[in-house]
From Swiss-Prot:
Contains FG repeats mediating the translocation through the NPC by interacting with transport factors. Its main location: nucleus. Keywords: Acetylation, mRNA transport, Nuclear pore complex, Nucleus, Phosphoprotein, Protein transport, Repeat, Translocation, Transport. Residues 122-150, 185-212, 412-422 have a biased composition (Basic and acidic residues). InterPro entries: NUP2/50/61, PH-like_dom_sf, Ran_bind_dom, RanBD_NUP50_plant, RanBP1-like. Sequence repeats lie at residues 245-246, 260-261, 262-263, 273-274. It is found in: Nucleus, Nucleoplasm; Nucleus, Nuclear pore complex. Residues 245-274 are annotated as: 4 X 2 AA repeats of F-G. This is Nuclear pore complex protein NUP50A. The modification Phosphothreonine is found at residue 430. The lineage of its organism: Eukaryota, Viridiplantae, Streptophyta, Embryophyta, Tracheophyta.
């Protein structure tokens, strides 16, 4: 028990005696605060207050209805008016005068320390408020003045641009009219010449309306006599062939030619490629691809009848193992001329010949895994090999294997025996029945 009493408790970390904060950043503020609390504030005397001037600033209350923002593009006119502008170009709107009176300084007297401190605090606050309000009003006035100046500048620039555009259009129209008549520089025309030009333009528009051409093509058609919409400004009928989107005929109907091509001139002048239009047409008519000639392919099976046909896979026994040779259609063909039979197999897809073997009487067939059958034959397709080779065929169904066996057994002995018998039945050629010299 004594040991437990002697055990000391773990000591706590020593904490600060006073908590520092923003209101109490230092440790020596207690003395100052005590002094401030003990003292009392004194009001300045009436004479001092009378000598001071207290200024009270009140802000203007904004109106309930907001003023609509002025449109800076309201004065822009794309089409220039005939009457000159009433206001001169260089004048700007006068600046609005300020309504608030300038800030006035507060007069202070060097008197008692308590009165000076109290007056300084009150006056500094009032002056700061007044200066802030004055700066805000000046900024708003500057913004309004800049806005008015910018709108006036925009209007002036718009009128100048419109006048320049109208002048440019007039100059372009005069230049276009001059290209059809003369190649000399433009000169000022008299009143009579202008009247004649207007009459000519009116006659041209009436003729275009009679021919059925709308106004959209008139601006392009006045530059050339052949009414080609997309040719040069000074193109004529005597010029060479050029690229166009089709020619408009005089009667208003389009031609039968291609809309997108090289237009051929009406005269016999030389074209771009050094040949006339008629020769080009003749060459295009004569240049045609010859018809494809059908090539007859002979497989050698034209004079044969198919006795058996089925799909199978062929294997060849080489070096102690079976190697696949291909997949395709196996046929037993019998010649219609001499009655001989042979095995023919072609690969599927490219019809490559992979088996061509004649049947012989000693040919033996052996079953292999129900769906397969083996035999020995001489394959004429395999080059460089002489003698018999062992092949195996695998079919899809065992019944096909039996059909193949029956077909082989039936035609492997098919030698020209019947024809030999027919030949033997013919009468022998003897001196009696032999042809004479007179017969030949």
């Amino acid at each position: 028990m004594g040991d437990s009493e002697n055990v000391q408790q773990p000591s706590k970390k020593r904490g600060a005696l006073k908590q520092l904060s923003r209101d109490n950043p230092g440790l020596d503020d207690d003395d100052d605060s005590a002094e401030l609390e003990s003292g009392t504030f004194k009001k300045a005397s009436d004479e001092v207050l009378a000598s001071r001037r207290i200024v009270r600033v009140k802000r203007k209350e904004p109106s309930a209805a907001p003023v609509a923002a002025s449109n800076p593009f309201a004065g822009i006119q794309l089409v220039p008016t005939t009457a000159p502008a009433s206001t001169p170009v260089g004048t700007n709107a006068p600046l609005a005068e300020s309504k608030l009176a300038p800030a006035e300084a507060v007069v202070e007297d060097n008197q008692k320390a308590s009165d000076i401190e109290e007056g300084d605090e009150v006056d500094s606050k009032k002056v700061d408020v007044k200066d802030a309000v004055g700066e805000e009003t000046e900024k708003t006035k500057d913004k309004d003045d800049n806005h008015c100046g910018k709108s006036a500048d925009v209007q002036v620039a718009a009128t100048e641009v419109a006048q320049m555009v109208s002048c440019d259009t007039n100059v372009c129209n005069n230049a276009v009219e001059g290209t059809d008549q003369t190649d000399f520089p433009l000169e000022k025309d008299s009143g009579g010449d202008q009247a004649e030009k207007k009459e000519k333009e009116g006659n041209g528009i009436e003729e275009a309306d009679k021919n059925g051409d709308n106004g959209a093509f008139s601006s392009f058609q006045q530059h050339s006599s052949n009414k080609n919409a997309f040719t040069g400004l000074a193109s004529t009928e005597a010029s060479g062939s050029s690229f166009s989107f089709g020619l408009v005929s005089q009667d208003g109907s389009t031609g039968t030619g291609s809309l997108f091509g090289f237009g051929l001139p009406s005269s016999n002048s030389s074209s771009i490629f050094g040949a006339t239009g008629s020769s080009i047409i003749k060459k295009s008519e004569g240049s045609g691809f010859p018809p494809k000639q059908e090539v007859s392919t002979e497989t050698g099976e034209e004079n044969e009848k198919v006795a058996f046909s089925a799909d199978s896979i062929m294997f060849e026994y080489l070096d102690g193992g079976w190697k696949e040779r291909g997949k395709g259609e196996l046929k037993v063909n019998v010649s219609s001329n001499d009655g001989k039979a042979r095995l023919v197999m072609r690969a599927k897809g490219n019809y490559r010949l992979i088996l061509n073997a004649s049947l012989y009487p000693e040919m033996k067939l052996a079953n292999m895994d129900k769906k397969g059958i083996t035999f020995a034959c001489v394959n004429s397709v395999s080059e460089g090999k002489e003698g018999l080779s062992t092949f195996a065929l695998k079919f899809k169904d065992p019944t096909i294997v039996e059909e193949f066996r029956v077909a082989i057994d039936k035609h492997k002995d098919s030698k020209p025996m019947e024809k030999a018998a027919e030949k033997s039945a013919l009468p022998l050629k003897t001196p009696e029945n032999s042809p004479t010299a007179t017969d030949t």
